[in-house]
Amino acid sequence: MSGSHVILIRNQQEARRVLEEIGVDPGAYPYLLPKASFHCIKLKDISFRGANIIKQEMLSKGGEAAIARQALFGKGSGDVLLMGTLKHYRLLINKLKVQPFGLKKVATEIENILVALEPKQQIIELPHGKSLKLGERTLIMGILNVTPDSFSDGGKYLNSDQAVKRAREMIDEGADIIDIGAASSRPDSVMAGADEEIQRLLPVMDKLAAQDIIISIDTFRGEVARAALENGAHIINDIGSLQLDSQLLPVLVEKQASVILMHNRMQIRTGEPYRDLVADIITELEDAIGHAVEAGLPGDKIIIDPGIGFGKTPGGNRLLLKRLGDFRSLGKPILIGASRKSFIGQTLGLEVNERLEGSLAAVAIAIMNGADIVRVHDVEASKRVATMTDMVMQENG
């Protein structure tokens, strides 16, 4: 063997690094870089007439497109799998922009996906003079439940002094964000009312005011979000993607707050089966993003969460971790919250207090597949795993 080997190139930055190592003339970069990144892009619900045009155009550019057999013979619509380099896609986009059957919109979608796939740094401006810097390293969100019935730590931090002590511990352990929840989202729990939720939150927030920490509030209620944001909160972590309370979005727009949109069919579309788990979640998150932006919330204040543990099977949750990179096509920072969840227990046959290793494995996998923020109970251990994983992923060569 001579040392020849396959090399995995995930983006244009890595492609450029390889060309530099080889000693390629920089003048050749514009011609070589678009050929070095290969991507498969799945288009949803394309008319068969449009699918045939896409296939013909992609083939003529040297790429490939897979369409349904019936697309050649009948009317209707279906999915299309595109296969090609960045060069193929750029040529295809230029052609589709002048084609009928809605293909101009498809061209824009492909263009946006390709932009989103490249790594980037982003600063989200938050209320009260704070900002969230994403892209340099994985951020750690520490979980603080001030509830009697949360699945993992319910009842431990009902007293505000105990809650603040735990928050300070997590800050010392490396948390970048403290996510405070005052109403359990457990399926069998009795949901606290808005007044009770606020009464649990405000004493803790008041005592945390002196801490140099970003505070996220885990709520779907507009009334609670308003009270929290007016008392020092920076982010609203909405488990309902704006569908559980119509009053939440106007508050977010008014306060120009950052929001985490979590996918969740448990309370919203109970029992509705998935046709394609990942594609369906992407579509529903895309709808939520569009709804927020149309209402006046800047798109750069939105973070997405595929909602591990909410209306998915254990296998579905594992698949979401495996295919988390697919969600990068939405162009938003990604948060993952898998810590101590039941799918880990079902996979490993472990009770909730025995799920540390499974939770840490989920953290590492999520980061390797594109997570920007990990929401965890075990901050110190998760911080170490995140730091190690970040260093591996950022290593040159």
What are these regions (language model features)?
Residues 165-181:
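Catalytic domains of carbohydrate-active enzymes, especially glycoside hydrolases
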Residues 31-46:
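Short glycine-/aliphatic-rich beta-strand segments at the starts of folded cytosolic domains
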Residues 25-35, 65-75:
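Short, flexible, solvent-exposed loop/turn segments with mixed acidic/basic and small polar residues
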Residues 58, 91-100:
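Short amphipathic alpha-helices in soluble, non-transmembrane regions
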Residues 1-34, 53, 93-97, 105-145, ...:
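N-terminal amphipathic alpha-helix/helix-capping segment at the start of soluble metabolic enzymes
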Residues 2-13, 45, 49, 53-56, ...:
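Active-site-adjacent loop and "lid" segments of alpha/beta metabolic enzymes
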